[in-house]
Design a protein with these regions (language model features):
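Conserved beta-sheet core of the metallophosphoesterase superfamily
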Residues: 90-179
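Cysteine-centered metal-binding/redox modules
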Residues: 179-217
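N-terminal active-site segment of His-dependent metallophosphoesterases
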Residues: 1-61, 151, 155
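Short, glycine/acidic-enriched loop or turn micro-motifs at the edges of active sites
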Residues: 10, 55, 80, 117, ...
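Active-site neighborhood of phospho(di)ester-bond hydrolases with catalytic His/Asp-centered motifs
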Residues: 5-6, 47-52, 72-78, 112-113, ...
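A short, conserved beta-to-alpha structural element at the edge of catalytic cores
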Residues: 24-40, 70-90, 154-172
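Metal-dependent catalytic neighborhoods of phosphoester/phosphodiester hydrolases
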Residues: 50-67, 76, 81-96, 121-125, ...
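A general structural motif
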Residues: 44, 69-71, 107, 126-127
């Protein structure tokens, strides 16, 4: 399984960060974030961590990262300094470290990086969305008008989010906001052309040739 997350901020002592996340201290924040992460991620999963891992130049943050399961890939953020990147490399915490990553998943293409980046064709049949963090917004669709989906811990109850859940979220966003005009609900969720104005929830195309997957399963 593929997971995406960002903005652990391990060792960040400032209350303005950990208090809004529902914690009483930065130590509690670190322990709960690690617990949540390891509850859902398996050792053979792939995890894209989109920056701002640690906030102190000591062993605390590194030890936190070592406790996280999965094959971890880092898209570095503004707090991932050269010194910290060097430490990540020496300790072999990540499989790879880059500015960003692009992956294709089904009909979607995702550009993943730390800072939000406006995408030009996120409304198209084969959309490209930016997965990013940095802003610490709680609304994962705060910048959806620019094709940006927020994967930071703040927007996902301090858990990483799976790529399947992201796709499900985006499909529902398209439907709820009528970015693709709804006729047959099945086609809208699947982002395919509807060939009927039937109101029974299915068009003839869907009945004849149902698409794989889909919000309704």
């Amino acid at each position: 399984m593929i997971w995406v997350t960002s903005d652990f901020h391990f060792g960040h002592e400032k209350e303005f960060l950990w208090r809004p996340r529902g914690f009483e201290s930065w130590q509690e924040a670190a322990e709960q974030i690690i617990k949540n992460y390891n509850e859902v991620v398996e050792w053979d999963d792939t995890v894209y961590i989109l920056g701002d891992c640690v906030l102190k130049n000591d062993d605390f943050g590194l030890e936190c990262l070592k406790r996280l399961k999965g094959n971890k890939f880092l898209a570095f953020g503004n707090h991932d300094t050269d010194m910290r990147l060097s430490a990540y490399t020496i300790e072999q915490i990540f499989c790879d470290i880059q500015f960003g990553y692009r992956i294709k998943y089904g009909k979607y293409s995702f550009w993943m990086c730390h800072h939000p980046m406006k995408m030009g064709n996120y409304k198209e049949k084969r959309p490209v969305w930016n997965l990013s963090g940095h802003t610490h917004q709680k609304d994962r669709f705060e910048n959806a008008a620019d094709g940006i989906y927020n994967v930071s811990l703040d927007a996902h109850d301090n858990y990483p989010v799976s790529i399947d859940e992201i796709v499900k979220d985006i499909k529902k966003y398209h439907y709820d906001n009528q970015i693709i005009q709804p006729r047959c609900e099945k086609c809208v969720y699947e982002m395919i052309t509807c060939h009927s104005s039937d109101t029974d929830g299915k068009c003839e195309k869907y009945k004849r040739d149902p698409p794989d997957g889909g919000y309704y399963g």
